[in-house]
Each structure stands twice: as C-alpha cells, then as structure tokens.
Amino acid sequence: MTADNGHDNNRHQYTAHVPVLLDEVLHYLSPVRGGRYLDGTLGLGGHSEAIMNRCGGDAWLLGLDRDREALAAASGRLAPFGDRVTTRYACYSQFAAIMDEIGWTGLDGALIDIGVSSMQIDTPSRGFSFYADGPLDMRMDPSGDMPSAGVLVNTGSVERLKEIISTYGEDPMAGRIARAIVDARARNPIETTARLAEVVESAYPAKWRAKSRNHPATRTFQALRMAVNGELEELETFLAAIVDRMNPGGRIVVITFHSLEDRLVKNAFRDEAKGCLCPRHIPVCVCGKKPRVNVLTRKPVTAGQAELQANSRASSAKLRAAERI
C-alpha cells in the first residue's frame, strides 16, 4: 500500500484513535495467520491495524471506504504492512466485485462497523453534527454526485421529510419537524447545521425538551444522514452477498448503532442459520434449504463499563457475529 504523504505527515493524530468494541471484534473475528480479511468500513484503520497485529502481520486484508479523507489516513496507518493490505475507494456493498478484481475467492473474516466516524463528527465542514456549526452536507463522500442533506432539507416535501425522520430517526415528532422545516425554509434556505438544529428544536413542545436527555435534533440528523448515504440499502446489499463469499469457518462481524440496522443483521443471520422451511406436515424435506451459518451472538454484544467511560459514543454500539458452516 502506498501512503498519502499529506496524511502520513499527520499520522500521529490518528494513532490515538481507538475503534469501538475492539476487544470484542478480535474475539469474534478470531483472525489467524495466513487468513484473508475484509474491513468494509476502513475508517481510520484501527480495527484493521489490530487484525493485522493479531496475525503478526502474516495475513491479507482488503479495506474499503467511501470517505477519501479517511481512506488516505488509514493508508498511512497501515503502510507498515506493505502489500499485505489493499485499500480501495468503494462502498462496502461493492466488496464482491473488488474481491474478483484482486483475485480473492473467499474470506476468513469480514467486518463492517456502520455509522459515522469520530473524525467525521468532529469535522464541522462535513456537516454531520450540530455541536459545531457547518454546512449542511452529511455525505460520506463529499466529492460524489449524491445530493447533500442541504438539498434534501430544502427540496423535500413535508411528506418525504416526515417519512425520512419517522423511518430512520424513529422520532415521534416527525410530522411537526417536517412542517417546521418547510415553513422555515420558505423564509430562508436552511444551509447550516446550527440553523437546522434550531428549527428542529422549535418543533418540540417545551415539556418534551425538558424531559429529553438528548438534543431534540439528534434523531433528525441521524435520519438525514442515513437517507443521504443510503445506509440501510447498503447494509441489505452486503448481507445478501457476504455469506456466499465466506470460507468454511469464516466469521462475519457487524457493528451497528441504530435499531433498524441491528434488526436487519439479526434477521439476516437468523435466516441464514435456518434449515428446512417445509411445512411440518411434510415428512421429508423438499425445499433443500440447509443452514449456512452458526450465529455466535444470541444477543447483541455491547460495550463494557470501561469502554463507555473512555468513549461515550460506544453506548449505542451493538455487535453481532456469525460463522460460515
């Protein structure tokens, strides 16, 4: 792997980054020397670095990310592993095509850590957070041609905005928020994270604001980010394809931060673990379906107290794992 010099010079700012549920990832992924591993959400490369270190550098890793800035930073971090690490600018749902491109036929482990990274949240110009004012963007890949959150907020109908906030944010105030957004943009376009947060907060009754532990805009920002980046669709595509690409004994580890995502993973693993689907009154199986995975996590694995004290953002992380039969 060739490191990007512009980011390698600042590499020290990323080495302190500790990825979420790191010990749990290594436990369930159980990487071994000579294995081939996919990190579909490379981010700053923390999980990948730990996987390679666990194998003494004697493994092969494919890292994907659609955030060019994060990809460049991870490339610098993983440069010591040389050509044993391959990185690509891509969505994790594209993993199979990239495996074909580089000649990989099977995986011994696959990891995706879904959601926005600390680097993205902490960079105001990316527009993911309302804690620091910035342009209303929220795209994982700002250089791409997908519409930003600003476009969605300033052009979406009340019905469309309500659907997004209700579905992806599960916010009971979705209708009020959608109407408040449309009313506010009629006066002036909503172009910054601070203004959107103010508009959303104004839609909440005072009694709701008083009893809520989180900022009223939290769910709306989450919903818009998921809609802008097609996050649920991305996950569905990945889950439909990953089992076919796993070697026997290969493990799939998925970290989610949203109940909808966790539900998709839970159901996908459950369905792949099922055998015969024939009605009970049929004495001999005619469907031919056989279990393809063993589910390793009966319930989602969450962060321990020590990690929560060190990183409050880990509080909503849930890990599920399955092993290819």
UniProtKB/Swiss-Prot annotation:
GO terms for biological process, alphabetical: rRNA base methylation
Subcellular location(s) per record: Cytoplasm
A molecular-function term among this protein's GO annotations: rRNA (cytosine-N4-)-methyltransferase activity
Signal peptide span: none
Chief location category: cytoplasm
Keywords on record: Cytoplasm, Methyltransferase, rRNA processing, S-adenosyl-L-methionine, Transferase
Catalytic activity, as annotated: cytidine(1402) in 16S rRNA + S-adenosyl-L-methionine = N(4)-methylcytidine(1402) in 16S rRNA + S-adenosyl-L-homocysteine + H(+)
E.C. no: 2.1.1.199
Binding site for S-adenosyl-L-methionine: 45-47, 65, 92, 113, 120
Pfam families the record matches: Methyltransf_5 (PF01795)
Keyword S-adenosyl-L-methionine: yes
Enzyme class, UniProt record, top EC level: transferase
Annotated GO CC locations: cytoplasm
Entry's family note: Belongs to the methyltransferase superfamily. RsmH family.
Known role: Specifically methylates the N4 position of cytidine in position 1402 (C1402) of 16S rRNA.
Database matches in HAMAP family: 16SrRNA_methyltr_H (MF_01007)
Full protein name: Ribosomal RNA small subunit methyltransferase H
